[in-house]
Structures are given as C-alpha cells and as structure tokens.
C-alpha cells in the first residue's frame, strides 16, 4: 500500500482527494491536515466522507508526522505550498502540488501573474508538469509534480494537439471558459455568496487571469483568455477559437480525426461529434472534446468539458501520482460521469 498524506485536506480539493483515495486500491490515507479545521472530524465537515473515513480527524501540520510518507498531496495557497514542498523534499517519497507554485518554468512570471517573487526558482526545473496526456513519460518516477490549473487542463487538452500537429495558427487564439463556483474554493467570499452567483453569469480576470501564461506555456499558443463564473457547483466548459495554419484547409471531420487519433489510447479523453456538456463529466476524470471548422468565418472551434474538481484538480493529481509511482493510471478514478 502507498501511504498518503493530504496537506490542506479541509478544502474542496482536499475533500475530493479524500473521496478519490477512498476508492483507490493502493492508497492508504495516513495523515490529513487542515490547520483552520484542526481537531475537526473529516466526516463532520464533509458528511459524504463518513462511510470511508469515520475516524479521520484533521490535524495541524507537523513535518515529523509527514516524514516517511510515500506520497503527499499539497492543497494549499501558492506561497504556502512552495515553502511546504521545500520543507518536505527528501523527507517524503513523491510530492504532488495542486497550487501554481511550480507550474511556470519562468520565475519572472510569478510577480506579474501571482503577485509574489518565487523564492526557490531552482526547483522549477525539477518539477514535472502533471498532465499525463501531454507529458506522460516525464512523470514516471517524478518526485515533485506540479498539477495544472483547472482552466488550463481544459484549454490545453483542446488546443495542444492542434498546435503540435500544425493544424492551427498559434497566434491570436481565443479561449472563453466557464467554471462552477467550487473553483473559487471553500472559504466564503462576497463574490461567491449564493445571492451573488445565483441567476448570474459573469466574466472576471479580464486580460489578466493567472492561468493565461500557463495555457501559453503548455500549448505553445498566444492566448486571449477570458474566464466566467457559472451558478453551478462543478464543471468547466472551454470554447477555443483559432485560425487554421497557413496553407491548410481543415474540415470538421479532419479536426475530429486529428483529436481522435491524438487521444486514441487515452483512458480519460472522449472525442465525439456531439457538443460536450459539463454534466456528462460530473464526478469523473474524463475530458469530453469536440471540434468544428466554420467555412463561413474561417475559424476552427474546439470545445472541452471537464469536472473542475476532478480532472481539473484532484482527479488529475491522482492520475499524475499513479503514473509517477508506476501504478495503474486509472486506479481510483472513474471514466463515467454521474447523471442525472
């Protein structure tokens, strides 16, 4: 069995990690922290976990308690996660960080996009990006994994195959994406209160959302990214627009064939002609994609739907950990969504 620690287990991504660990045949949760909830039973905060973790109590972080664990997930704010990873390196087997602390390879981007100076830029080269569909081999045996942002997962799975195969012009790509409110985290905020989000649909982070440079880093495209908040709990739908590469004349069929071929052996990517829906991915680790070419306007359109807490965060983290540890990549993860 793989001994697992979840640092920051009291947040939504932490609770999702616990849910997935409960069904994982190789994971045994040995340690779960939640400093603001230290002393609180996990089942008290999240009754959905009562069947699997009736006696688990969130603890305050103690490096000695974490030492020797095979696998540690970090579900903390970026700067806290950065310092935690440094403290745990060499004391635990594999670290999977769900924050952005190690996602960007260029340390100069952190002050502009995240508002802090990266104090350990030497670790950015060591960290392996945790999106198996686009970099599986690098993950094998990795000891420090940076999992993608939720929007980045959806946009990158949609765009990267087309950029890599030379099907679209990488300049001037537009990504419009909408997310459920759980992406904002468990802490109460004025802009995520029920009365604020109910019956509302709003854009935010105009021209400066922090996932922009990450999408560009992963896809190799220049991106104008606009996120939106939708009054639902979970899910992301990304709609991406690009011009065809110079000298190419795509069709809807050729785009679907390209995506289908690129992801033919992927257990968690579904390519269909039908438009994807977030509800179809709910609770699963799947990404649902489709594509179109509009002859009238000359645009390529690619859509991707995921569950932001599953494939977009905790599910993707478990998938990356499975690859790093040499386990069955699909262990603990569902490829069928919940409906209705």
Question: What are the residue ranges of the model-derived segments?
Answer:
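Short glycine-rich or small-residue beta-strand-to-loop segments that form or flank ligand, phosphate
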Residues: 3-6, 146, 239-241, 302-305
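A short coil-to-beta-strand element that immediately follows conserved catalytic motifs
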Residues: 29, 170-175, 224, 268-272, ...
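Alpha-helical scaffold segments in soluble metabolic enzymes
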Residues: 16, 20, 157, 161, ...
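Contiguous C-terminal substrate-recognition/catalytic subdomains in enzyme active sites
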Residues: 192-284
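Electropositive phosphate-/nucleotide-binding environments in soluble metabolic enzymes
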Residues: 11, 78, 125, 152-156, ...
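N-terminal Rossmann-like NAD(P) cofactor-binding subdomain of oxidoreductases
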Residues: 1-204, 292-296, 339-340
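C-terminal active-site/capping subdomain that shapes the small-molecule cofactor and substrate pocket
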Residues: 241-340
């Amino acid at each position: 069995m793989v001994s697992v620690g979840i640092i920051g287990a009291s947040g939504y991504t932490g609770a999702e990690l616990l849910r997935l660990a409960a069904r994982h045949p190789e994971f045994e949760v040995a340690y779960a922290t939640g400093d603001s909830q230290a002393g609180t039973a996990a089942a008290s905060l999240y009754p959905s976990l009562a069947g699997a973790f009736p006696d688990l109590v969130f603890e305050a972080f103690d490096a000695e308690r974490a030492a020797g664990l095979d696998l540690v997930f970090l579900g903390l704010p970026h700067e806290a996660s950065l310092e935690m990873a440094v403290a745990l390196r060499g004391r635990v087997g594999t670290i999977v960080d769900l924050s952005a602390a190690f996602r960007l390879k260029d340390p100069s981007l952190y002050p502009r996009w995240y508002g802090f100076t990266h104090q350990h830029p030497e670790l950015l080269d060591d960290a392996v990006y945790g999106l198996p569909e686009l970099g599986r081999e690098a993950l094998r045996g990795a000891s420090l994994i940076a999992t993608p942002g939720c929007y980045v997962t959806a946009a990158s799975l949609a765009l990267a195959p087309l950029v890599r195969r030379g099907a679209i012009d990488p300049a001037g790509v537009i990504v419009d994406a909408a997310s459920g409110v759980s992406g904002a985290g468990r802490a109460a905020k004025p802009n995520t209160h029920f009365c604020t989000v109910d019956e509302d649909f709003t854009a935010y982070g105009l021209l400066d959302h922090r996932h922009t440079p990450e999408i560009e880093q992963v896809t190799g495209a220049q991106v104008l990214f606009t996120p939106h908040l939708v009054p639902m709990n979970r899910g992301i739908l990304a709609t991406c627009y690009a011009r065809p590469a110079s000298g190419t004349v795509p069709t809807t069929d050729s785009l679907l064939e390209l995506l289908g071929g690129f992801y033919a052996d992927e257990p968690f990517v579904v390519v269909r002609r039908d438009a994807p829906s977030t509800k179809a991915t709910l609770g699963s680790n799947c990404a649902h994609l489709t594509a179109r070419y509009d002859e009238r306007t000359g645009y390529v359109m690619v859509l991707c739907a995921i569950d932001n807490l599953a494939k977009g965060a905790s599910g993707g983290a478990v998938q990356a950990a499975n690859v790093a540890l040499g386990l069955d990549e699909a262990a603990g993860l569902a490829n069928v969504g919940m409906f209705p």
